[in-house]
Regions:
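Conserved hydrophobic beta-strand within the GNAT/NAT acetyltransferase core sheet
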Residues: 84, 118-122
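Short glycine/proline-centered loop/turn elements that form peptide/ligand docking sites
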Residues: 103, 125-129, 146-151
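Conserved G/P- and acidic residue-centered "switch" motifs that form tight phosphate/ATP-binding loops
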Residues: 97
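Conserved catalytic-core motifs of GNAT/GCN5-like acyltransferases
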Residues: 121, 134, 139-156
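Short amphipathic helical patch at the helix-1/turn junction of helix-turn-helix
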Residues: 89, 123-124
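Acetyl-CoA-dependent GNAT
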Residues: 2-8, 15-94, 103-105, 109, ...
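Intrinsically disordered, low-complexity acidic/proline-/asparagine-rich linker or regulatory tail/stalk regions
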Residues: 166-169
Length: 169
């Protein structure tokens, strides 16, 4: 669990759990329920499976007992990369460092699982997200024409992750 100061509020980061299911589904709809993201919402059954899956990590940000953001990481057993599948921050919690803190927590989780890098895809028309990842040390590593359901291209980004220093006794 991590606490972070976001303006005048304290936000707590923790692993998602089954009891977060309703809040995660509501948050997903609040953030992504628009024509731009049509068909890309994570469903209730998918969230339920992901919360219980050993090959996924859901990290949530809570303020005042309510979820305000989440990040979903996926892990393949035969890959040295973790995949950031989704990140969502409620409108009222944006521009307070929550996304950057979630990203840092996800990177630590990836390293703890033995991964040496993280990958993600982002809509080519999402300039804010592209700038966020670039300023977080991610570099563009690929281009996927017509990747999204509305035929918008995706840009792939990746970042090498440093292993935590080994402790000497």
């Amino acid at each position: 669990m991590t606490r972070l100061q976001a303006g005048h509020a304290t936000v707590t980061l923790r692993r998602g759990r089954g009891s977060d299911l309703d809040a995660l589904v509501a948050l997903e709809r609040e953030i992504f329920d628009s024509a731009r993201f049509a068909g890309h919402l994570i469903s209730r059954p998918s969230f339920r499976r992901l919360l219980a899956s050993p090959s996924a990590t859901v990290i949530v940000a809570a303020h005042g007992g309510q979820l305000s953001a989440y990040m979903l990481m996926l892990y393949r057993s035969n890959s040295k990369f973790a995949r950031m599948y989704s990140i969502g921050v409620a409108p009222h919690a944006r521009r307070r460092g929550v996304a950057r803190t979630l990203l840092g927590a996800a990177e630590k989780d990836a390293v703890s699982r033995g991964r040496s890098g993280m990958r993600l895809e982002v809509r080519a028309d999402d300039r804010g997200a592209i700038a966020f990842y670039e300023t977080s040390g991610y570099r563009r590593s690929g281009h996927h024409p017509g990747y999204y359901r509305d035929r918008v291209d995706a840009l792939r980004f990746e970042k090498a992750l440093a292993k935590a220093p080994e402790r000497r006794s």
